[in-house]
Amino acid sequence: MSKFLSQAALNTLRNTRLGSRQLVRSFAGIASTRNHSEPARQEEVYGQARGRSLLQMRMPVAGRRSMFIQTQDTPNPDSLKFLPGVDVLGKGNTYDFPNGTTAHSSPLAKLLFRVEGVKGVFFGADFVTISKQEGAEWSLIKPEVFAVIMDFFASGLPVLHDAQPNADTEILEDDDETVMMIKELLDTRIRPTVQEDGGDIVFMGYEAGVVKLKMQGSCSSCPSSIVTLKNGVQNMLQFYIPEVESVEQVFDEADRMVDSEFERFEKNLKTLKQQEPSGGGPQ
């Protein structure tokens, strides 16, 4: 089949009247734990030193204007979305840093991983999603994250150095019609809704009727991610593309190994602290 016919099929998807959020929600059959009709909670912060306090004020950025940092809850209680009011990666772009060892290409990600309790960092078009370690308190993490984001955007440094945002849904010359339609549907109907929840879905491949996807950001460890993937994404893909038989979640084994090593290190550190004598003087 010619590329022109494939493009016609893609245009049909683009012209579908039902919006992306309605489609994903209706196919999933579940409501998000966050009320999307409510505006983001606005956290206005101001600081001068590293030990800054959280106040209801404006923060001058680069001597030009004030920065308002907003936060939005996500379906994952261990992930929080921060909106600095400026572009982070630009429209449609995302980048995932599941752990500190992957942050070498981003000065901002490196700084955020230095905040105690931060487990993962995810960049979107105009937001930063922070995932915290289990047991860590947002009340302690949020002020530090606010400070890092403000200081960084005041510095004028690039968010990313050499790495490029995800291009997994870019149409390639050797893509067949089914793959092209999967990519188009993911890019125009599914990913925008997932990104609103502070995460992303990355296309990893298609073979023998199985679409392989990787969850990122707040979606990677969200309790409802499997339900969303199967009941929402899979049903939508099957509705438009009969060739799709199922959807599978793909995990990065390297990321799993790093997370496992980090958790073991954390446990050893806690054990050592518990073994330290609590008395003030020599026994």
Curated annotation (Swiss-Prot):
GO terms for biological process: iron-sulfur cluster assembly. One of its GO terms (molecular function) is iron ion binding. Residues 182-250 are annotated as: NifU. Signal peptide: none annotated. [4Fe-4S] cluster binds at C219, C222. GO terms for cellular component: mitochondrion. Keywords: Iron, Iron-sulfur, Metal-binding, Mitochondrion, Transit peptide. Pfam families: Nfu_N (PF08712), NifU (PF01106). SMART domains: Nfu_N. InterPro entries: FSCA_dom_sf, Nfu/NifU_N, Nfu/NifU_N_sf, NIF_FeS_clus_asmbl_NifU_C, RNA-helicase_DEAD-box_CS. It is found in: Mitochondrion. Molecular scaffold for [Fe-S] cluster assembly of mitochondrial iron-sulfur proteins. Belongs to the NifU family. This is NFU1 iron-sulfur cluster scaffold homolog, mitochondrial.
